[in-house]
Amino acid sequence: MWILSNLMGTSEEGNLLSTVSPTVKALFGKTRVSPIFPFSPRSPFQPLIPRTPGSPWGPVGPASPLGPGFPIGPMGPGKPVGPKGPMLPLGPSGPVGPTSPLFPFCP
């Protein structure tokens, strides 16, 4: 019986509903202007800053990856790792080739 009463929440739910009713009514009543005010500034303001990921992510996303994103990803680690790897061994491996032109070029 007590569980049913608790589940039904006659006294607790009644109180909660009573408190929620006026709160919801007050929120709903003021919601007409309150939600419009906070929504207007929050929609354009918050979406511009926190939700701006949509706008900046779109243009900035492709711009970043296209410029620094793409080159840094494939070019940065790809080019330096690829050419630097074989270049380093090529330099010391073939010191006669680069040494000859480097020596006369330096002096």
From Swiss-Prot:
Q: Where in the cell is it found?
A: Cytoplasm
- Which keywords does this Swiss-Prot/TrEMBL entry list? Cytoplasm
Disordered: annotated span: 47-107
Q: Which GO terms describe its cellular component?
A: cytoplasm
Work out whether the entry's keyword set contains Cytoplasm.
yes
Q: In which tissues is it expressed?
A: Expressed in prostate and testis. Weakly or not expressed in other tissues. Overexpressed in prostate cancers.
Chief subcellular location equals: cytoplasm
Query: Which portions of the chain have biased composition (kind: Low complexity)?
Result: 81-100
Coiled coil (residue ranges): none
Q: What does this protein do?
A: May be involved in growth and survival of prostate cancer cells through the TAF-Ibeta pathway.
Q: By what name is this protein known?
A: Prostate collagen triple helix protein
Record organism: Homo sapiens (Human)
The gene for this chain is PCOTH
